[in-house]
Amino acid sequence: MAVGKNNNKMGKKGGKKKAVDPFSRKEWYDIKAPNMFNTRQVGKTLINRTQGTKIASEGLKGRVFEVSLGDLNNSEADFRKFKLIAEDVQGKNVLTNFHAMSMTHDKLCSIVKKWHTLIEANTAVKTTDGYTLRVFVIAFTKKSVNQVKKTSYTKTSKIRKIRSEMIGCIEKEVTGCDLKEVVSKLIPDSIGKDIEKTCSKLYPLQEVYIRKVKIIKRPKVDLGRLHDLHGDSITVGADGEKVDRPDDYEPPVQQEV
């Protein structure tokens, strides 16, 4: 057998596959926030087009979007983030509902103080429409008027009483409300202000905030209630949309079929 280079190059089985742009199979959907917020159009999201049994709208349901409250309410100075969960799709609009709330890490670091007592509390509360929320609150002790002492620490027994008052305030504010009313209270953080006012009789407090809220149990999606939250965001359904045409309009004739 002759030793040498074989010049008869055999082609590989199958030709070179043509590169396909993955974005050509995707389509954009608008993310709509509930009407508790000033800005309703908060962004866009991508999903593969409907193919066979894979329906695009079903793939969007359950997606969670994190948006700053500053973007939702057109305010520059805000340190809270809201998570919105997609619950329904109408046309090209993704209808979302409240999912969670938290403070930014920078804000949490900025409120921590030396020579003060940090007090935290959390409790699970149920709303009137069947949601179970876990609410976390954070607070710091404050120097009393004309205090000379450098530190403002409080006793453990008093911390327990303050924590009990915090939980009582949260239950009072949330238990008799539905989820929409709770979110309306979280936006200006009125619950934190009420806690600070109530606990001041035990020990003066400062920097009292609802640190985090998360849903630990949610009922089945109520489309009627969800559509009420998105009254002006719902697009035209299967009946289509009316298009204004002149009376003498004639459709163009196709050149090829």
Curated annotation (Swiss-Prot):
GO terms for biological process: translation. Residues 237-257 are annotated as: Disordered. Its main location: cytoplasm. Keywords: Cytoplasm, Ribonucleoprotein, Ribosomal protein. GO terms for cellular component: cytosol; cytosolic small ribosomal subunit. Residues 239-248 have a biased composition (Basic and acidic residues). Component of the small ribosomal subunit. Mature ribosomes consist of a small (40S) and a large (60S) subunit. The 40S subunit contains about 33 different proteins and 1 molecule of RNA (18S). The 60S subunit contains about 49 different proteins and 3 molecules of RNA (28S, 5.8S and 5S). HAMAP family: Ribosomal_eS1_euk. This is Small ribosomal subunit protein eS1. The lineage of its organism: Eukaryota, Metazoa, Ecdysozoa, Nematoda, Chromadorea.
